[in-house]
Regions:
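Radical SAM enzyme [4Fe-4S]-AdoMet core and its adjacent flexible, acidic
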Residues: 41-57, 64, 68-181
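Canonical radical SAM enzyme core domain
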Residues: 1-42, 49-61, 79-90
Length: 182
């Protein structure tokens, strides 16, 4: 429409992902974001089911299958780091060890009173983790086990989207988000 190109992305926690949905996603979606907060203990702490059981063991095999079905392209494993996993480079390495090639991990956005909220005093540790991650990526690349980390691929000359930084989310400024309820 009017020389516009629309790209469709879906984000999933993987719980309801099955072969039929995977087929639809691979046919209709340009990109897929797979929400996995980190290593098993981190993910299960942040994403338990109502019965208290963690979701990691259910979703990881589904995510691996989907990533392979897309030839390790046009998807991202998207993690979230919190005060509970400021050592998030270990989560990225865990994703790589699971066979994923496209990764992202972002800081949690929450009220400062939340126990998992990142605090100003955590910033030096976070900066250290990004440096550590860069070194680990170089080593993995030398070993023939390279992977992409989304935030190291951003055009630094273009700068971050101001609206996204102000709202902590690109929804409504860069993209349209639709909840399960429409």
């Amino acid at each position: 429409i009017h020389n516009k190109h629309f790209r469709f992305t879906i984000t999933t926690n993987g719980v309801l992902l099955n072969d039929e949905i995977q087929e639809f996603v691979n046919k209709e979606m340009d990109n897929v974001v797979l929400s996995l907060d980190g290593r098993k203990e981190i993910n299960d702490q942040m994403r338990p089911f109502r019965n208290g059981k963690g979701s990691y063991d259910l979703i990881v095999p589904k995510f691996q299958k989907l990533a392979e079905s897309r030839n390790q392209e046009k998807y991202y494993i998207r993690g979230t780091f919190t005060r509970n996993n400021l050592d998030f480079s270990n989560d990225i390495m865990h994703f790589a060890d699971l066979g994923f090639k496209q990764m992202s991990i972002e800081p949690v956005v929450g009220d400062e009173s939340d126990p998992y909220a990142i605090r100003e005093e955590d910033i030096p540790k976070i900066m250290e983790e990004y440096d550590k991650l860069a070194k680990m990526m170089i080593e993995r690349e030398k070993e023939g086990k390279g992977f992409n980390f989304f935030h190291f691929m951003i055009d630094l000359n273009g700068g971050p989207c101001v609206a996204k930084r102000l709202s902590a989310c690109g929804s409504g400024t860069e993209y349209l988000a639709v909840t399960p309820w429409g």
